[in-house]
């Protein structure tokens, strides 16, 4: 500062002794120095602290350098970028994240209802009431199979349709997961349940697995017998269950022998139970307990497999039942083949019954107790004793009646 004051005083002294022509030049130099100092103060005060430190080191100069160097004109403010310059990428000290374009929204899939005649009792999705009637009962969605009344379709038609569910899961449910395992406990189950996109367990799967496990537990603990859905109500009233778990027809006499051909493969080699002594009947009861609730069925119709895990059926095939936890699709075994088949395609063959094939068509009067049969139709004889007039009582599916013995051939 002393140097600056001395330098500023020197022109004053010189101005007193200098001629008038040089006075104006000295005043200009003083004015330039004054403007130079003011420009530095203006820069330091006007610039904010953030902008001041963002400037490069080459642009910053010490105050002594600013005072000692000749004045430099201030750079003009940068003009706004033109349209041609906007296309060029200019680096910025703090770049802002460029927003990504939004993904195209998928169209919402709505229900596609069509008229449907419901053969079974189906509740409405909206009012939860049963859909009843003979014709034009209600509507059902093509994709998700949701059932609604005609008057309830307007409110639910605007809702989103979840789409078609997996065919194998809907048909077979969770039966394949529980076949070769003991009855599982739902709380300690180690199965890997199917999870959705959000990682949550499917509630339908949990409900089905819980019901299946309860059915297996009840069957193993109480030895409950499984019956074919094709049996009529009157036929169930005539059947009684003995202590060993086998079922006999009440129409048979107490002296009639029950042939164990269709109960288990190991029992077909031995004679009837009436020929055995009481001491020899103990192994049979043990064998019956080991086999469990596996019964013999006969195929009534031909079934072609629709999936890899289906079991092909031919009329007259003998099937050993493995799992009947599902109402519509059962799991059975024919020789070395194991798979699923429709439950209404087979009929239960109980001890004492024979399987017959119709060798010639027969037309009978239903009101008189006769049953009509087509050629090669499979039926099961209810009793072993033939009627006096040459007729035998048989059943095929839900039909039941008398058929002449000449029209049947035992399989």
UniProtKB/Swiss-Prot annotation:
<dbReference type="InterPro" id="IPR001452">
    <property type="entry name" value="SH3_domain"/>
</dbReference>
<dbReference type="Pfam" id="PF00130">
    <property type="entry name" value="C1_1"/>
</dbReference>
<dbReference type="GO" id="GO:1903078">
    <property type="term" value="P:positive regulation of protein localization to plasma membrane"/>
</dbReference>
<comment type="subunit">
    <text>Interacts (via SH3 domains) with CACNA1S. Interacts (via SH3 domains) with CACNA1C. Has much lower affinity for CACNA1C than for CACNA1S.</text>
</comment>
<dbReference type="InterPro" id="IPR002219">
    <property type="entry name" value="PE/DAG-bd"/>
</dbReference>
<dbReference type="Pfam" id="PF07653">
    <property type="entry name" value="SH3_2"/>
</dbReference>
<feature type="domain" description="SH3 1">
    <location>
        <begin position="292"/>
        <end position="351"/>
    </location>
</feature>
<keyword id="KW-1003">Cell membrane</keyword>
<dbReference type="GO" id="GO:0003009">
    <property type="term" value="P:skeletal muscle contraction"/>
</dbReference>
<dbReference type="GO" id="GO:0009898">
    <property type="term" value="C:cytoplasmic side of plasma membrane"/>
</dbReference>
<comment type="function">
    <text>Plays a redundant role in promoting the expression of calcium channel CACNA1S at the cell membrane, and thereby contributes to increased channel activity. Slows down the inactivation rate of the calcium channel CACNA1C.</text>
</comment>
<keyword id="KW-0472">Membrane</keyword>
<protein>
    <recommendedName>
        <fullName>SH3 and cysteine-rich domain-containing protein 2</fullName>
    </recommendedName>
</protein>
<feature type="region of interest" description="Disordered">
    <location>
        <begin position="64"/>
        <end position="95"/>
    </location>
</feature>
<dbReference type="GO" id="GO:0008270">
    <property type="term" value="F:zinc ion binding"/>
</dbReference>
<keyword id="KW-0728">SH3 domain</keyword>
<dbReference type="Pfam" id="PF14604">
    <property type="entry name" value="SH3_9"/>
</dbReference>
<feature type="compositionally biased region" description="Pro residues">
    <location>
        <begin position="70"/>
        <end position="82"/>
    </location>
</feature>
<feature type="compositionally biased region" description="Polar residues">
    <location>
        <begin position="19"/>
        <end position="29"/>
    </location>
</feature>
<dbReference type="InterPro" id="IPR046349">
    <property type="entry name" value="C1-like_sf"/>
</dbReference>
<dbReference type="InterPro" id="IPR036028">
    <property type="entry name" value="SH3-like_dom_sf"/>
</dbReference>
<keyword id="KW-0862">Zinc</keyword>
<feature type="region of interest" description="Disordered">
    <location>
        <begin position="219"/>
        <end position="288"/>
    </location>
</feature>
<keyword id="KW-0597">Phosphoprotein</keyword>
<feature type="region of interest" description="Disordered">
    <location>
        <begin position="174"/>
        <end position="203"/>
    </location>
</feature>
<dbReference type="GO" id="GO:0042383">
    <property type="term" value="C:sarcolemma"/>
</dbReference>
<dbReference type="GO" id="GO:0005829">
    <property type="term" value="C:cytosol"/>
</dbReference>
<keyword id="KW-0677">Repeat</keyword>
<keyword id="KW-0963">Cytoplasm</keyword>
<dbReference type="GO" id="GO:1901387">
    <property type="term" value="P:positive regulation of voltage-gated calcium channel activity"/>
</dbReference>
<feature type="region of interest" description="Disordered">
    <location>
        <begin position="1"/>
        <end position="29"/>
    </location>
</feature>
<keyword id="KW-0863">Zinc-finger</keyword>
<keyword id="KW-0479">Metal-binding</keyword>
<feature type="compositionally biased region" description="Low complexity">
    <location>
        <begin position="219"/>
        <end position="232"/>
    </location>
</feature>
<dbReference type="InterPro" id="IPR035509">
    <property type="entry name" value="Stac2_SH3"/>
</dbReference>
<dbReference type="Pfam" id="PF16664">
    <property type="entry name" value="STAC2_u1"/>
</dbReference>
<dbReference type="InterPro" id="IPR039688">
    <property type="entry name" value="STAC1/2/3"/>
</dbReference>
<feature type="zinc finger region" description="Phorbol-ester/DAG-type">
    <location>
        <begin position="110"/>
        <end position="161"/>
    </location>
</feature>
<feature type="modified residue" description="Phosphoserine">
    <location>
        <position position="48"/>
    </location>
</feature>
<feature type="domain" description="SH3 2">
    <location>
        <begin position="354"/>
        <end position="411"/>
    </location>
</feature>
